[in-house]
C-alpha cells in the first residue's frame, strides 16, 4: 500500500543478450513495457551504429506506407482498425515486407501516372469541345455588319480605301476565368487596340489533372491582322498560361472535328473509369492491412533503435544493455527474456544482472485511467525526486474540493457532472474513434478530474445553498417574523415607517436553530447577505488554507523519516510546524472560539479578530477598545510570538553548524581521505567487495553530507539555509493570504451568476403575456449559452487555474522538491495508439 504514496523502487540492471536472440528479447521487453534502456554509445554517431542499415530500411518501408496512406485518404477510403496487435516480424520477414510495399508503391505510382496522362488528354479534349461549340457563335457574329464597323480599326485607312478583301487571322483557346480582365487589358495595351477579343464562360468547372481541383475557365477567340500581331498574341497567351487549340475556319470542318472529339471523349471516359476502378481495388485492399503494416514496421524500427543503444562485446556474439526497471517487475522481465530466447531458437539463455550504482534512478508512479490525470497535474509542476512522497493521491480529493469551494453552485455542478459522466460512459467509443482535435483530447483526458470537480461543486453548492444564484428552500427557513410582533416591539407603524428591518435572534422564536444542511435560504433575500457570506467564506478560506499547508508540512516528515535525515526532522520539520501552528494555527483556534463563545445575546460585544491578530504582533494591548476574548490572552499570545521567533534561528543556524562540526570531526579523524576503492557489489561477484569506512547508502543520513568527491562549503550551506528559512517564514504569511482567493473566486462566481439571472432570465419571467412566453424561449437560449460560455467554461477555467496554483505553490512547496526525471519505458502500446513520433 505504501507504493501508492511514493514512487516505485527502481533498479539498474545489466542484460547479456546473445546476438541471435537479442531481437526477440528486446521485442518481448518492449511488448511488456517495463524497462527503460540507457544509451551505452553516447559518443557514437547515429549513422555509425551497428543496426543503422536496418533502421534505414524500416524508415524506407515507413515512407512507402505513408505514401499509400496518403493515397487512401485522398480517395476517401476508410482505413480499417480492428484493434489487432500483430506480432513483431522476424528479421528474415523484412525482405518479404519490402517486396510487398515496393510492389504496391510502384503499382500506385504507375496508375497515378497513367491516370494523370489520361486526365490531361481528357481535359484537352473537353476544352477543345467547348472551343468548337463557342467559336461557332463567334464566327456567326462576324457576319454581322455591326461587328464589321466595330473591328474596322484593325485595317489601315489606306487599305480600306483600296477595297481589299477583309482577311483576319485568329487564335482560340481556354484560360482561367479570373485572369480574363487582366488578359484583356494586356492585349489592348500591347497590341494598341488592333485585336478583337471575344470570350464566353464554360458553365461547368473542369478538373485539373495535377491537383485534382476543379477550376472555372473561359473560352476566348482573338482576331488580328498580320504575323507580327499573331506572334504578340501567342506570347501573351503563353504568359497567361492559356491553352491554345487549332480551330478550323469552315463550319463543316468544325462540325466534323467536334464529332470526332466527342467520340474520343467517350472512349477516354471509359478508360478513365476502368483505371479508377482498378485504383480503388488496390487502395481498398491496402486499407484493410495498412494499420497492421504500420505497426509491424514501426515495431521493427523501435527494436533496432533500441539495439543501437546496446554495446557489443569483443567476440561479437553478445549484446550488453543497461536498463532501469521497477524491482517489482523483475520476475516478469525474466519471463519476457525467457520467451524471447525460446522464440529465437537460441540455446543460450539471456542474463539479467542487478547492478549497484550511485546514480539517481528515474521516478515511476503507477497510475490507472482514474489517477492518470491527477498525476499529470503533479508532474506538470515537476517530476518527483526518486522515492519522495507523491502528492497525487491527496490531490485526487483536495484539488476538486478547492476548485468546488471557488465554483460552488449546485446547478453548475450538475451540468459539469453530466458532461463528465457522458465522457466516462462513452470513453470506449471515443477512444476507438481517435479524435485528433487537440482541445477535446485534452478535456477528455481529464474526464475524471471534471467528474470529481462537478460532484464537489454540487456539494459546496448545497453548502452555500446556491443554484443558479437562487436558494433552495428544502427544509424550510429557521427564521420567523411573527415573534417580532408577538414578543418583540414591532407594530404596523414599524413596517410602514422603516424601509429596512432587522430580525433579532435574541427574541425567542425568531431563530429556530441552524438550518439542517448548508445556509438558510432566507439569506438570499436579506440586504446584508453579502456581509454575512463574505465573513463566512473569508474565515472558511483561512481555515482550509492553514489546514492544507499544515498537512503539506506534515508530509515532509515522512520524507525525512524515509530518507533517514534526522537533521531535517529536528531542525526543519519541528520548527516549521511550531512556527506555523503558533501564528496561524492559533488564528484558526480563535475563529472557532469566537464562533462558539458568542451567541445572539452577546454577539454585539464580540471583539474583532483582525484587530486582535494585529495587536498580537505589535505587542499592543490598549485598555479601551477591543475587549479580550478570554482571560490570559495577553500572556499566551506573547508566548506564542516568542516561540515563533525562536523557531527562526532554530531553522537558520543549527543545521549548518552541526554539518560543519561533522565535517571537521571526520576531517580530523582522517576518514574522509581513506584510501579504499569502491567497487559495485553485484549479486554474482561476491568476491569483488572492498568496503570503505565511510561508504554511503542511498537511504542514509550521510546522503546529504559531503563525500570525498565534494568539499564542504560552510558559506554555501549557510546561504542555502538562510534562503530556505526566509522563504518559509515569509511564505507562511503570503501563502495564507493566497488562500483568500477561495473567497474571492467564490464571491465573483456568485455575483456573475446573479447578474446573469437578473439581466437575462428575469426579463423573460417578468413579462406576463403570450409574447413573454414566446420571448422566454429565446431568452432562455441566450441564458443557457451565456451560462455555459461564461460561468462554466471561463469561470471554471479560472477556478481550475487558481486551484492549480494553490497546489503547486502553497501545498507542494512544503514537502515536494520535484527535481527528478521521469521513467520512460518504451512500449509498443504507444505504437498501437499511434503515438510513435512522441
UniProtKB/Swiss-Prot annotation:
Cytoplasmic side, ranges: 1-388, 427-441, 556-573, 660-725, 811-838
Residues modified as Phosphotyrosine: 364
Vacuolar topology ranges: 408-409, 472-535, 595-639, 751-771
Membrane topology: Multi-pass membrane protein
UniProt modified residues of type Phosphothreonine: 250, 360
Biological process terms in GO annotation: regulation of macroautophagy; synaptic vesicle lumen acidification; vacuolar acidification
Listed Pfam families: V_ATPase_I (PF01496)
InterPro entries: V-ATPase_116kDa_su, V-type_ATPase_116kDa_su_euka
Domain of life per record: Eukaryota
Keyword annotations of the record: Cytoplasmic vesicle, Hydrogen ion transport, Ion transport, Membrane, Phosphoprotein, Synapse, Transmembrane, Transmembrane helix, Transport
Cellular compartment(s): Cytoplasmic vesicle, Clathrin-coated vesicle membrane; Cytoplasmic vesicle, Secretory vesicle, Synaptic vesicle membrane; Melanosome
TM helices/strands, residue ranges: 389-407, 410-426, 442-471, 536-555, 574-594, 640-659, 726-750, 772-810
GO molecular function terms noted in the UniProt entry: ATPase binding; proton-transporting ATPase activity, rotational mechanism
Gene Ontology cellular component list: clathrin-coated vesicle membrane; cytoplasm; melanosome; membrane; perinuclear region of cytoplasm; plasma membrane; synaptic vesicle membrane; terminal bouton
Protein's job: Subunit of the V0 complex of vacuolar(H+)-ATPase (V-ATPase), a multisubunit enzyme composed of a peripheral complex (V1) that hydrolyzes ATP and a membrane integral complex (V0) that translocates protons. V-ATPase is responsible for the acidification of various organelles, such as lysosomes, endosomes, the trans-Golgi network, and secretory granules, including synaptic vesicles. In certain cell types, can be exported to the plasma membrane, where it is involved in the acidification of the extracellular environment. Required for assembly and activity of the vacuolar ATPase.
Family to which this protein belongs: Belongs to the V-ATPase 116 kDa subunit family.
Quaternary structure and partners: V-ATPase is a heteromultimeric enzyme made up of two complexes: the ATP-hydrolytic V1 complex and the proton translocation V0 complex. The V1 complex consists of three catalytic AB heterodimers that form a heterohexamer, three peripheral stalks each consisting of EG heterodimers, one central rotor including subunits D and F, and the regulatory subunits C and H. The proton translocation complex V0 consists of the proton transport subunit a, a ring of proteolipid subunits c9c'', rotary subunit d, subunits e and f, and the accessory subunits ATP6AP1/Ac45 and ATP6AP2/PRR. Interacts with SPAAR.
Stated name of the protein: V-type proton ATPase 116 kDa subunit a 1
Amino acid at each position: 500500500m505504501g507504493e501508492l504514496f511514493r514512487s516505485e523502487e527502481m533498479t539498474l540492471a545489466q542484460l547479456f543478450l546473445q546476438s541471435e536472440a537479442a531481437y526477440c528479447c528486446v521485442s518481448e521487453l518492449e511488448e511488456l513495457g517495463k524497462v527503460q534502456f540507457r544509451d551505452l554509445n553516447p559518443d557514437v554517431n547515429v549513422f555509425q551504429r551497428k543496426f543503422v542499415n536496418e533502421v534505414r530500411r524500416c524508415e524506407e518501408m515507413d515512407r512507402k506506407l505513408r505514401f499509400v496512406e496518403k493515397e487512401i485518404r485522398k480517395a476517401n477510403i476508410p482505413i480499417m482498425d480492428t484493434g489487432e496487435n500483430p506480432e513483431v516480424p522476424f528479421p528474415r520477414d523484412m525482405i518479404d515486407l519490402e517486396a510487398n510495399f515496393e510492389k504496391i508503391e510502384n503499382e500506385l505510382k504507375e496508375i497515378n501516372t497513367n491516370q494523370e496522362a489520361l486526365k490531361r488528354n481528357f481535359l484537352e479534349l473537353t476544352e477543345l469541345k467547348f472551343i468548337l461549340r463557342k467559336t461557332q457563335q463567334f464566327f456567326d457574329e462576324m457576319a454581322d455588319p455591326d461587328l464589321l464597323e466595330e473591328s474596322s480599326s484593325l485595317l489601315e485607312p489606306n487599305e480600306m480605301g483600296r477595297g481589299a478583301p477583309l482577311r483576319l487571322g485568329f487564335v482560340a483557346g481556354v484560360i482561367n476565368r479570373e485572369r480574363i480582365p487582366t488578359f484583356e487589358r494586356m492585349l489592348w495595351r500591347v497590341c494598341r487596340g488592333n485585336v478583337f477579343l471575344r470570350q464566353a464562360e464554360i458553365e461547368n468547372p473542369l478538373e485539373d489533372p495535377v491537383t485534382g481541383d476543379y477550376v472555372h475557365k473561359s473560352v476566348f477567340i482573338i482576331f488580328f491582322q498580320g504575323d507580327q500581331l499573331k506572334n504578340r498574341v501567342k506570347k501573351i497567351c503563353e504568359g497567361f498560361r492559356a491553352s491554345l487549340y487549332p480551330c478550323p475556319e469552315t463550319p463543316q470542318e468544325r462540325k466534323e472535328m467536334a464529332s470526332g472529339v466527342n467520340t474520343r471523349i467517350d472512349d477516354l471516359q471509359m478508360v478513365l473509369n476502368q483505371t479508377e476502378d482498378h485504383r480503388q481495388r488496390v487502395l481498398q485492399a491496402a486499407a484493410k492491412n495498412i494499420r497492421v503494416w504500420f505497426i509491424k514496421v514501426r515495431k521493427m524500427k523501435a527494436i533496432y533503435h533500441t539495439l543501437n543503444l546496446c554495446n557489443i562485446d569483443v567476440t561479437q556474439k553478445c549484446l550488453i544493455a543497461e536498463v532501469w526497471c521497477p524491482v517489482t517487475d523483475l520476475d516478469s522481465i525474466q519471463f519476457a527474456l525467457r520467451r524471447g530466447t525460446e522464440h529465437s531458437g537460441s540455446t543460450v539463455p539471456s542474463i539479467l544482472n542487478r547492478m549497484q550504482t550511485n546514480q539517481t534512478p528515474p521516478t515511476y508512479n503507477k497510475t490507472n485511467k482514474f489517477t492518470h490525470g491527477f498525476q499529470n497535474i503533479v508532474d506538470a509542476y515537476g517530476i518527483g525526486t526518486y522515492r519522495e512522497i507523491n502528492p497525487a493521491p491527496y490531490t485526487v480529493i483536495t484539488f476538486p474540493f478547492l476548485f468546488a469551494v471557488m465554483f460552488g453552485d449546485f446547478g453548475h455542478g450538475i451540468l459539469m457532472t453530466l458532461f463528465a459522466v457522458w465522457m466516462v460512459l462513452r470513453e470506449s467509443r471515443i477512444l476507438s474513434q481517435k479524435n485528433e482535435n487537440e482541445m477535446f483530447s485534452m478535456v477528455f483526458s481529464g474526464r475524471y478530474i471534471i467528474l470529481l470537480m462537478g460532484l464537489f461543486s454540487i456539494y459546496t453548492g448545497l453548502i452555500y445553498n446556491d443554484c443558479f444564484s437562487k436558494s433552495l428552500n428544502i427544509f424550510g427557513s429557521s427564521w420567523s417574523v411573527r415573534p417580532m410582533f408577538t414578543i418583540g416591539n414591532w407594530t404596523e407603524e414599524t413596517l410602514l415607517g422603516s424601509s429596512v428591518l432587522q430580525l433579532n435572534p435574541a427574541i425567542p422564536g425568531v431563530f429556530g436553530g441552524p438550518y439542517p444542511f448548508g445556509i438558510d435560504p432566507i439569506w438570499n433575500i436579506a440586504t446584508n447577505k453579502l456581509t454575512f457570506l463574505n465573513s463566512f467564506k473569508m474565515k472558511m478560506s483561512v481555515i482550509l488554507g492553514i489546514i492544507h499547508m499544515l498537512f503539506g508540512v506534515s508530509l515532509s516528515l515522512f520524507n525525512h523519516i524515509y530518507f533517514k535525515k534526522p537533521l531535517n526532522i529536528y531542525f526543519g520539520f519541528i520548527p516549521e510546524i511550531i512556527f506555523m501552528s503558533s501564528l496561524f494555527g492559533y488564528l484558526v483556534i480563535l475563529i472557532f472560539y469566537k464562533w462558539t463563545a458568542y451567541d445572539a445575546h452577546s454577539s454585539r460585544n464580540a471583539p474583532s479578530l483582525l484587530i486582535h491578530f494585529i495587536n498580537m504582533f505589535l505587542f499592543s494591548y490598549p485598555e479601551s477598545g477591543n475587549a479580550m476574548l478570554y482571560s490570559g490572552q495577553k500572556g499566551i499570545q506573547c508566548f506564542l510570538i516568542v516561540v515563533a521567533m525562536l523557531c527562526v534561528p532554530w531553522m537558520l543556524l543549527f543545521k549548518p553548524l552541526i554539518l560543519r562540526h561533522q565535517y571537521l570531526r571526520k576531517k580530523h579523524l582522517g576518514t574522509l581521505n581513506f584510501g579504499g576503492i569502491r567497487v559495485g557489489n553485484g549479486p554474482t561477484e561476491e568476491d569483488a567487495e572492498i568496503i570503505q569506512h565511510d561508504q554511503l547508502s542511498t537511504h542514509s543520513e550521510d546522503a546529504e553530507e559531503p563525500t570525498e568527491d565534494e568539499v564542504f562549503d560552510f558559506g554555501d550551506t549557510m546561504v542555502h539555509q538562510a534562503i530556505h528559512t526566509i522563504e518559509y517564514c515569509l511564505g507562511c504569511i503570503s501563502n495564507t493570504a493566497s488562500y483568500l482567493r477561495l473567497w474571492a473566486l467564490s464571491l465573483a462566481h456568485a455575483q456573475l451568476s446573479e447578474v446573469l439571472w437578473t439581466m437575462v432570465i428575469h426579463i423573460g419571467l417578468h413579462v406576463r403575456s403570450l409574447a413573454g412566453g414566446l420571448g422566454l424561449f429565446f431568452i432562455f437560449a441566450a441564458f443557457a449559452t451565456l451560462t455555459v460560455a461564461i460561468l462554466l467554461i471561463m469561470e471554471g477555467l479560472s477556478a481550475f487555474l487558481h486551484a492549480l496554483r494553490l497546489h503547486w505553490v502553497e501545498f507542494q512547496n512544503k514537502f515536494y522538491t520535484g527535481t527528478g526525471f521521469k521513467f520512460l519505458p518504451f512500449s509498443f502500446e504507444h505504437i498501437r495508439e499511434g503515438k510513435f513520433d512522441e
